Amino acid sequence: MTLHTLDELLADGVQGRYVLVRSDLNVPLSGAEDTNLTVTDDGRIRASLPVIEKLAAAGARVLVLAHLGRPKGAPEAKYSLRPAADRLAELASVPVSLAADTSGESAQKAAAELADGQVLVLENVRFDPRETSKDDAERAAFAAELAELAASGADKEAAYVDDAFGAVHRKHASVFDLALKLPSFHGDLVRTELDVLRKLTDSPERPYVVVLGGSKVSDKLAVIENLIGKADSILVGGGMLFTFLAAQGHEVGASLLESDQIDTVKDYLARAEAAGTSFVLPTDVVVASKFAADAAHELVAAQAIESSSFGAAGIGLDIGPETSQAFAEQISAAKTVFWNGPMGVFEFAAFASGTRAVAQALADSAAFSVVGGGDSAAAVRTLGFADNAFGHISTGGGASLEFLEGKELPGLTALDR
């Protein structure tokens, strides 16, 4: 795969040129009103900033494309990029403004008024249903409108930079189709993510330990299958652990269970044993009376969840201290660690201990460590860990997993030309 770099674009010169940058501004927000929201984790904004500033500093007229959340193809106040754009403007050393629309007359007017070295964030691309359309023609038409924005008063050829690694697994108009319409390059963030993930897939230093958590085992099946025979150990926590316990014949009470995946998990356990990959499952679990921050809870053996005072109504919400210690020892002995998915409901203080223990073990480890984006990145920041405590915190949750699954990523395919 041959991808053109940002340095190549800068060497070619961007003074006075429009450069459309697909950034990842899909950040968590909080607030009582849809119109009074603030960014609670600006990690992705900070990660997107260097490319935007490099281009603006070199005299480009930067048009930032991004999405936030999952709007249903129409404007919704709670999904506006306004909070993200405001935070970007606070952090940036160059002028940043927000357009009221993504395309159309008002967006064209705002783009035409952009001066060299200025940045315009276009409104959420997913406000247009064509962004995520399965119809190739619809997506291509929307991409053409986006490309047209770069022709607003400019006499130099526009360019496209994909710096949204968290979206490269999507065949969307601003990720795939737009890259086919303009000279295209990949940004520093995408390059860094690829370099890091290739260390995990090409020749990881061993022992190579993978820590998987999160709610559903079905979300991780493909990556688990691809890791069998490649990872030395796979540590399983989070809601997905209960399907593994059920596959071993244990009762799991009212814990999250994907019964339709039990046979698949049984198959993976057998294949892993034959391939020399060991699954390390919890030996103790924190079981609660209900899914709530203030729920009564007890520590029980993982193989006897229904032995708690809650009986079959008990819900497992975190791994226990014995498991946390065992996982920490595995991480301490590793040379390479990839972690994706929290160990429990970290948003509730009573059930955050397992996730905190894994994060601390990674922070203390001398191994090359990668925190796989999404909920894992949010968890370590929520629990007070600095980004530099880990080797790398990925901005791509789903994209990272699909890369490790060996899947083709449309956003990268479009750049390979």
From Swiss-Prot:
Major place of residence: cytoplasm
Top-level class of the enzyme under EC nomenclature: transferase
Residue positions binding substrate: 24-26, 44, 67-70, 126, 170
GO CC term (a single one): cytosol
Cytoplasm keyword on record: yes
EC code(s) of this entry: 2.7.2.3
Keywords (A to Z) from UniProt: ATP-binding, Cytoplasm, Glycolysis, Kinase, Nucleotide-binding, Transferase
Transmembrane segments: none
Highest taxon, organism lineage: Bacteria
InterPro entries: Phosphoglycerate_kinase, Phosphoglycerate_kinase_N, Phosphoglycerate_kinase_sf
Family: Belongs to the phosphoglycerate kinase family.
Name assigned to this protein: Phosphoglycerate kinase
Species in which this protein is naturally found: Renibacterium salmoninarum (strain ATCC 33209 / DSM 20767 / JCM 11484 / NBRC 15589 / NCIMB 2235)
Protein encoded by which gene: pgk
